[in-house]
Amino acid sequence: MDIKEIALGQIRDSIATKQKCIDSILEDIIKAGEIVSKILQAGNTIFLCGNGGSSCDASHIAAELVVRYKSGNERKALPALSLSADSAVLTACSNDYGYEEIFSRQIEAFGRKGDLLIGLSTSGNSKNVLLALEKAKTRGVKTISLLGGDGGKMKNLSDLDVIVPSNVTARIQESHILIGHIICSIVEYNLFKME
């Protein structure tokens, strides 16, 4: 196998995973976009959390909502926050309460009835994301999980699960960011009639 074959294999695997998303979870993706739109139309806040690459995806999606998704779409800022963005809170909470509490503690502080938490986990087994989703339920915060594989321990914990049909972390992450982009596109269309 040469380098070109490796590259082509990655691209083909990515395309195949996205085709599986069209075939099996398109309606869930659209539903997620509609939920996020309604939360924002009501003036509530979107929180996002995840670990590692999923943390980066959470921050990326939050930035698209706060700033804008499509270049040239001038619109007002939307309230969205990645819970992995504040290093002081993350390190203080990790030190004082444990890493598992870094997101749930912030939901306890900031989450209000009518807000939405989007938890991202390629395995569905991230304890700190799971605890944040559980805390959200106690505060009247709606929940969406972006997962992979069989959904892990987080499956059926949220109001809506969007489970990428793959067990390959890279393919799940690629699909999660695509799902995030689709959600942002739906939001900009629903709230501002921007395509």
From Swiss-Prot:
Keywords: Carbohydrate metabolism, Cytoplasm, Isomerase, Metal-binding, Zinc
Domain SIS: 35-195
Swiss-Prot/TrEMBL cofactor(s): Zn(2+)
Entry superkingdom: Bacteria
Any GO MF annotation of the entry: carbohydrate derivative binding
Chain positions recorded as substrate binding sites: 51-53, 64, 95-96, 121-123, 126, 173
PANTHER family hit by this protein: DNAA INITIATOR-ASSOCIATING PROTEIN DIAA, SEDOHEPTULOSE 7-PHOSPHATE ISOMERASE / DNAA INITIATOR-ASSOCIATING FACTOR FOR REPLICATION INITIATION
Free-text function comment from the UniProt entry: Catalyzes the isomerization of sedoheptulose 7-phosphate in D-glycero-D-manno-heptose 7-phosphate.
Other facts noted in the record for this chain: The reaction produces a racemic mixture of D-glycero-alpha-D-manno-heptose 7-phosphate and D-glycero-beta-D-manno-heptose 7-phosphate.
Record-given protein name: Phosphoheptose isomerase
Organism name: Leptospira interrogans serogroup Icterohaemorrhagiae serovar Lai (strain 56601)
Highest classification ranks of the organism: Bacteria, Pseudomonadati, Spirochaetota, Spirochaetia, Leptospirales
Gene: gmhA
